[in-house]
Each structure stands twice: as C-alpha cells, then as structure tokens.
C-alpha cells in the first residue's frame, strides 16, 4: 500500500468514491473518451481540471490512446503536460486498484498547470519514484503469489504421485 500522507487522505477518499462511477460512465458512452472526461468533471469541484483537459485536447491533435505508462514518465521528465489526458485514459483501464498512483501523477500535473495541487511540493523525481516503488511492490506481490501457486501445484503433484505409487504397490501385493 502506498504511504498515504494525512493531507492527501481527503483527496484519495473523494477520488475513490467517484472512481467507479467514472469508469462506468466512460465505458458506457460512445463519444471520445476525453469528451466524456470533460462531462464527468463539469461539477464545480472539478471545473479547473476540465478547463485544463479541454485546453490540452484542443491544443494537441494526437492519438491519446497510444500513450502508455512508460511514455507518461518520459513526458513528465520532458514537461509535456499533454500526458494529463493520457493519464486519464490510463486510469480508465486501471482495473488492478492502482488508482492512487495514477492520481498522484494527475495531481502533480494539475499542480504544474494550475498551481493548486495537494502534491505541490512533490518533484518529478519524487512522483516517478512513487510509481516505481508501487510497481516494484506490485511485482513482488505477484511474484510471491506465483511462488505460492507453484508450491501448491507442486504439493498437489506430489500427493497424486504418492497416491499412484501406493495404488500400484497395492495391486502388485494383491496379485
């Protein structure tokens, strides 16, 4: 679990409570996803973010769906804020519960564009480090799960082999 700093807790709570609704809305409509994003953030609380996304979407004609997490890190390093839109696309496909990391990226970018982010004191390196840390942690968790599954399978195989050997021995003794 990412370390949640006290001043970020309300942000994450709000984000998590609206995330499911956002995912459902984006997947059910046929308009371009960034247009759906604008619709989602039309509430007064998110007006500033909608303006930022609208400006980026109008300013840059690009295939936003081609943006990947690795390209996001490159964009952060080079200061290309168009990746804010890519982040929201990444969030849309984020079904593994990693929204906090994505939202940390998003908050950082909003700060760079609007100077109103709760992550105002985070640097590029710190934000990228958060993501790398989270990715490594998830990888280790997956690795542990795989090892556990493999050991379970190995135990089942041993049990089956033992049963087979016992059955063969019983058959020989009865013959």
From Swiss-Prot:
Chain segments carrying region Disordered: 153-175
Q: What name does the UniProt record give this protein?
A: E1B protein, small T-antigen
Annotated membrane-spanning segments are none
Give the protein family: Belongs to the adenoviridae E1B 19 kDa protein family.
Which keywords does UniProt give here?
A: Early protein, Host-virus interaction, Inhibition of host apoptosis by viral BCL2-like protein, Modulation of host cell apoptosis by virus
Q: What does the record list as GO biological process?
A: symbiont-mediated suppression of host apoptosis
Pfam families for the chain: Adeno_E1B_19K
């Amino acid at each position: 679990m990412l370390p949640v700093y006290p001043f970020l807790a309300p942000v994450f709570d709000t984000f998590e409570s609206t995330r499911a609704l956002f995912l459902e809305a984006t997947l059910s409509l046929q308009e371009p996803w960034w247009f759906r994003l604008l619709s989602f953030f039309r509430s007064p609380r998110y007006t500033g973010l909608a303006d930022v996304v609208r400006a980026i979407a109008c300013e840059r004609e690009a295939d936003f769906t081609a943006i990947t997490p690795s390209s996001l890190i490159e964009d952060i390093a080079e200061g290309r804020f168009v990746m804010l839109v890519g982040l929201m696309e990444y969030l849309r496909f984020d079904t593994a519960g990693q929204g906090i990391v994505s939202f940390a990226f998003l908050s950082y970018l909003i700060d760079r564009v609007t100077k109103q982010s709760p992550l105002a004191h985070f640097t590029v390196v710190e934000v990228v480090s958060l993501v790398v840390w989270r990715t490594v942690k998830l990888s280790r968790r997956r690795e542990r799960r795989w090892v556990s599954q493999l050991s379970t399978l190995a135990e089942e195989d041993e049990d089956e082999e033992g049963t087979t050997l016992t059955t063969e021995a019983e058959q020989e003794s009865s013959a």
